[in-house]
């Protein structure tokens, strides 16, 4: 395994693949991604969630044209309240993120609200690239959304079972998988490229709501 931070390693075969791995934080950091806990208050999370349920909000179902064996998610166009909550949270940490990755933010994509209902999941994927598979084996990633360099993911609730984020190609020194259990009000920031391909574990008990925006950087 190859160390990409003080605590996290990349699998050898993935690291050796020839695909874009920009940006990447210094390996002197404890972790190669950032987690900002309690960035959004419980009241703000509640206000954001209520804005989805308090109006005749029509979700854009992700299912038409997509393979539900890979992804079972509902995407909502964000409400005004959700946009306000996200932007306030993001600008609290913007400079820290830029310093951590040695980048400057450019334009971001449109905000998305991701809802995972009972049994909802998302199998391993990279946010800006498609898998290159040969003879049934992953051999690399091809960038298909170059405007996505960094992923900012904010969680609005945690009153459900499952729904963990696992980074498929990363491990701890002892070989354990890198799995993050989301907490309401926190934001996690990580590169959008193939090295940080990740999956969302199946959700049970309650619906899981998260807000995501991808950023181009230089």
How does the language model describe each region?
Residues 1-190, 194-218:
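Fe(II)/2-oxoglutarate oxygenase catalytic core
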């Amino acid at each position: 395994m190859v160390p990409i931070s003080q605590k996290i390693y990349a699998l050898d075969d993935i690291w050796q693949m020839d695909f874009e791995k920009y940006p990447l934080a210094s390996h002197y950091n404890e972790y190669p991604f950032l987690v900002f806990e309690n960035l959004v208050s419980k009241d703000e999370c509640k206000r954001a969630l209520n804005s989805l349920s308090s109006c005749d909000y029509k979700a854009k179902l992700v299912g038409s044209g997509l393979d539900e064996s890979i992804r079972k998610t509902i995407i909502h166009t964000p409400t005004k309240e959700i946009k306000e909550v996200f932007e306030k949270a993001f600008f609290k940490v913007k400079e820290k993120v830029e310093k951590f990755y040695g980048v400057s933010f450019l334009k971001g994509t449109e905000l998305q609200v991701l809802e995972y209902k009972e049994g909802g999941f998302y199998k391993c994927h990279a946010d800006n690239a498609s898998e290159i598979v040969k003879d049934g084996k992953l051999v690399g990633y091809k960038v298909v959304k170059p405007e996505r360099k960094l992923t900012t993911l904010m969680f609005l609730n945690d009153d459900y079972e499952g729904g963990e984020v696992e980074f498929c190609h990363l491990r701890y020194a002892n070989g354990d998988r890198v799995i993050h259990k989301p907490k309401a009000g926190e934001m996690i920031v990580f590169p959008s490229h193939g090295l940080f391909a990740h999956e969302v574990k199946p959700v049970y008990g309650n619906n899981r709501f998260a807000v995501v925006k991808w950023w181009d950087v230089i």
